[in-house]
């Protein structure tokens, strides 16, 4: 049975909703995927993520191929052209199919009169592809980052910025966390190999496995039974730094979607975990993950700046604060971050992090441990944030995560195979 939709036009709509309406792909794609077949969902994701990964390059190429940019109601066709060029430059889709489907996308988008324009621009790109792609390696579009973010990264990492940028522009690896309640990591590796899935263990993590060629979770042995969870290596490490212990009261603040909550409970299944997040919709994901993994926690909707509304005068032995942040360490996983984030957001996020840290500190027991974590690579949110916190709180001290140049542990993307992350482990005197 032939599909009644055009996938390229749907992708153009996804790009439009990100760039012109400020929505994230993680919000946009699930809604758009409701009306397409399971077979087409990976391609929609590949095209949407791919276009946003190399956006400046596509913008520059279209600027070379067209005299006037498409504006107003025709702007959606600008994004359709991006989808077409991305297919020709970066995918194995046969050129004739990429052209035909993209041109038909103009009809689906109710711009039949511009089919010829779309066809002409794409064919012109085909003729000039080698020359144009070579030019993009030597012009302002080369780094594939907004100028403000590139400048900040260069300032923060004068020796490593190129490595960091290159990592951001790659497709991310797929990491798993083995639930050791059911299997050891080596046992699960054997199950993967028996299923024909190539994988390798992380050198220093007790639970992490990297899938060599990312695959649907539905084919992972025991995924629906809670044997394994998809979670980046760096995200796993911050829970390991927390060192949860059975019998303790543990708070996971800003917990959604619940990956760290469930890992706490896998390490210490008899701990009393409270998982809190401000987003009611994302709290549903926490509950879903707890159910799949057969874990039990108290789940609450609440603002980290106002624990008096949900903490009920409790004090905790350990607190994991995965703070709201710029997410600049996970750009390879969420390339839309580059275009949704604004430079002025950083100061606001730093202020929010500071307020949450100050508000939650009194709820940590004496001699208790707090792990502050972000998926950011920017010093303002990380080392500098912890430096300011230590100056405000004389009863706080770092506990073994500091390095020579940082009050905590800063990981840049791909350094250990994981995402960009920051951790600081604090104890209360």
From Swiss-Prot:
Cellular localisation: Cytoplasm
For the ligand (S-adenosyl-L-methionine), the binding residues are 254-260, 277, 303, 322
Keywords, A to Z?
Cytoplasm, Methyltransferase, RNA-binding, rRNA processing, S-adenosyl-L-methionine, Transferase
The protein's superkingdom reads: Bacteria
**According to its UniProt record, which residues of this chain constitute the active site?**
375 (nucleophile)
Q: GO cellular component annotations, sorted alphabetically?
A: cytosol
Q: What InterPro entries has UniProt attached to this entry?
A: MeTrfase_RsmB-F_NOP2_cat (IPR049560), MeTrfase_RsmB-F_NOP2_dom (IPR001678), NusB-like_sf (IPR035926), NusB_RsmB_TIM44 (IPR006027), RCMT (IPR023267), rRNA_ssu_MeTfrase_B (IPR004573), rRNA_ssu_MeTfrase_B_ent (IPR023541), RsmB-like_ferredoxin (IPR054728)
Any GO MF annotation of the entry: rRNA (cytosine-C5-)-methyltransferase activity
Name of one Pfam family that matches: NusB
Gene Ontology process terms (BP): regulation of DNA-templated transcription; rRNA base methylation
Give the chief site where it resides.
cytoplasm
Give the EC number(s) under which this enzyme is classified.
2.1.1.176
SUPFAM superfamilies on file: NusB-like (SSF48013), S-adenosyl-L-methionine-dependent methyltransferases (SSF53335)
Query: Which major enzyme category is it?
Result: transferase
* Catalysed transformations (reactions): cytidine(967) in 16S rRNA + S-adenosyl-L-methionine = 5-methylcytidine(967) in 16S rRNA + S-adenosyl-L-homocysteine + H(+)
Q: Which family does it belong to?
A: Belongs to the class I-like SAM-binding methyltransferase superfamily. RsmB/NOP family.
Main function: Specifically methylates the cytosine at position 967 (m5C967) of 16S rRNA.
| Name of the protein in its database record | Ribosomal RNA small subunit methyltransferase B
Lineage, uppermost ranks:
Bacteria, Pseudomonadati, Pseudomonadota, Gammaproteobacteria, Enterobacterales
